[in-house]
Amino acid sequence: MTEYNYDLFIIGAGSGGVRTARIAAQHGLSVGIAEQRFLGGTCVNVGCVPKKLFVLASQFPSKYYLSESFGWKYTTEPKFSWQVLKENKDKEIERLNQIYDNLLNESGADIMHSEAKFIDQNCLRVGNKNVTARNIVIASGSKSNQPSFKGNEYVIHSDDFFSMEKLPNKILIVGGGYIAIEFACLLNNLGVNVTIINRSNQILRGFDREMVDKISQSMTQAGIKIHLDNEISEVSKFNDFYNVMTEKGCSFQVDKILSAIGRSPNTENLDLEKIKVETSKNGAVIINKNYQTSVNNVYALGDVVDRFQLTPVAIHEAMSLVNCLIGSPKQVDYENIPTAVFSTPEFATVGLSEESARKRFRNIEIYVSSFKSLSSSMSKKRDEILLKLIVTKNDQIVRGCHMVGENAAEIIQGFAVALKAGATKQIFDNTVGIHPSTAEEFVTMRSITR
């Protein structure tokens, strides 16, 4: 019988890779894990965690001015320091990195801070040595897409954003997905002049259009300029500014350009071709329902398979994969996965959009409610909340739950449990609400909008 250095070796120590390593080690497997960049992956270091911290920082100005209508008066204007935010963010990320390091060490997994490449299906080159394993998991995550226009070397990506030396005065953001929208809103809240350019005719494709229209309207009212159906043709540098030309002849002069045109599976430097692991056109590793690739002892999960680029999904996949390895497979249910866009206003959703529901079901009922939030009720601020339920007519099952407004993510996370359990509209109606709260509106909507 062949002896290996490890029962299981994982390439990539992001959320999915770390969870795989820990759970496998708890089941008695000998585990190694390689990470050449930083523990915690994209989410902890250059993704959701620092993004949310920056979003929170950007919300204080509006709370400051809103407080005046509640009787607060200040003798001096608040001042914002980008450097202080960056330094404190770095400390928090270092703390989280150390937590991941401790968790792996406590589990008994061996951590190797090096790049890993395939030599054969059981052997990897990790740093300057060869490592063998009975099974190997690819959890190498994703990388920012590079735009193809002339002058793309002047562009920064979402990974670079959190290490910018100073806050720009004017920024052009390329893209219309959730990353672009979140950065646009937080920068606008911090006083930056923001313009978005998107090659598509809409932002946030795939989300419920009614909700997206509300976000787009709010962004425009806040001063964010959105250019759709257009793309950059060329960027040139002039002193401390960048001149941007578009395909439709528009021109912009900005001091920073941020590309947020999505992320692709990070598989380029793994030498997958040596073992003939099948990938899609964009480099995503192709897997079966048990996360097994075309090579029987090689598995993959998380962003690298390009199914759902969400940290909680990767964590669930990790637990499911380990169950498969130890002989008790349990599949991840990809229906009704909640998600949020930390825009201004915040947007969160679970289940089907109205557009998707109309394609899937013959008859649906739509419930919509909009109202001014209590927090802005005594001010001149137009902070309107929009809620939406999508119900199939024949069985009255709630198929979609959407919210635009303050604390949307926290509220929708709770209702995601109801949708996962197959709750009907009657169950919603029979639930007593908490008053006064935004969330109670979801259980008091009685009139069908359409």
What does each model-identified segment do?
Residues 2-6, 22-29, 34-167, 195, ...:
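Glycine-rich flavin
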Residues 2-14, 167-177:
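Beta1/beta-strand and adjacent pyrophosphate-binding region of the FAD-binding site
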Residues 113, 117-125, 131, 190-289, ...:
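A Rossmann-like FAD-binding core segment of flavoenzymes
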Residues 48, 138-197, 225, 273-275, ...:
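Glycine-rich dinucleotide-binding loop and its adjacent helix/turn
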Residues 153-168, 251-326:
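FAD-site-proximal beta/loop scaffold in flavoenzymes
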Residues 12-15, 36-37, 174-177, 207, ...:
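Glycine-rich Rossmann-fold phosphate-binding loop(s) that bind the pyrophosphate
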Residues 9-16, 20-37, 49, 53-60, ...:
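Flexible, glycine-rich terminal cap/loop adjacent to redox cofactors
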